[in-house]
Amino acid sequence: MQKSYIKLLVLGDSKTGKTTMMMTYSTGSFPTGYVPSHVDATSLDIEYNKQVCHVGFWDSSALAEFDNTRPSTYPNTNVIILCFSIDSPTSFENVSKKWIPEIRQYAPSIHTPIILLGTKCDLREDENTINLLKENNQMPPISYKQGLALSKEIKATMYLECSSLCNQGVNEIFKQVVRCHLYCKDGVLNDPTTTTSNTSKCIIQ
């Protein structure tokens, strides 16, 4: 039986843990050595509800030098993961300031599913992180409620959180990618196989 192919585009500010998250998923463990700013496109088979899809991961760099070439990564994208880091208010603000306008301009369809992902959720209660943000006159780590509100504001398909360091919620992200591809129609997720929320705090809009 031929597998469906999913082109997955991962977006978000630099240092939000996009590449680390993908490496953690593909290897099963948190990378302890050098982590590049982005990795070349790779692919893996992922199963959801007994259906296996071949998912191609496109890790898009957020560096300014790639602003002119990044639009070329959008064509044929089936699902987008848009990341912000829970310890970075700036990356949170840039979701609606920078990334959503870019997505609306270049995504192949206004109905392309978007998973808003809060990374590094292990830092939400971290004392050093909280103190550092306070010293820099920044808002505290992003709360779950704030992330959920933003996902509704940008009309994301769902909101998830993860910690690559703790390997929390990472596997679930990619199951939800397949789920979005299989069951999203006109931007609405209608999965007949489940009516309950999952363990990674998946909120369906």
Curated annotation (Swiss-Prot):
GO terms for cellular component: cell projection; cytoplasmic vesicle; cytoskeleton; plasma membrane. Keywords: Cell membrane, GTP-binding, Lipoprotein, Membrane, Methylation, Nucleotide-binding, Prenylation. The modification Cysteine methyl ester is found at residue 202. GTP binds at residues 12-19, 59-63, 119-122. It is found in: Cell membrane. Pfam families: Ras (PF00071). GO terms for biological process: actin filament organization; cortical cytoskeleton organization; establishment or maintenance of cell polarity; regulation of actin cytoskeleton organization; regulation of cell shape; signal transduction; small GTPase-mediated signal transduction. It is a lipid-anchor. SUPFAM superfamilies: P-loop containing nucleoside triphosphate hydrolases. InterPro entries: P-loop_NTPase, Small_GTP-bd, Small_GTPase, Small_GTPase_Rho. Its main location: membrane. A motif (Effector region) lies at residues 34-42. GO terms for molecular function: GTP binding; GTPase activity; protein kinase binding. Residues 203-205 form a propeptide. CDD domains: Rho. PANTHER family: RHO FAMILY GTPASE. Belongs to the small GTPase superfamily. Rho family. NCBIfam families: small_GTP. This is Rho-related protein racI. It comes from Dictyostelium discoideum (Social amoeba).
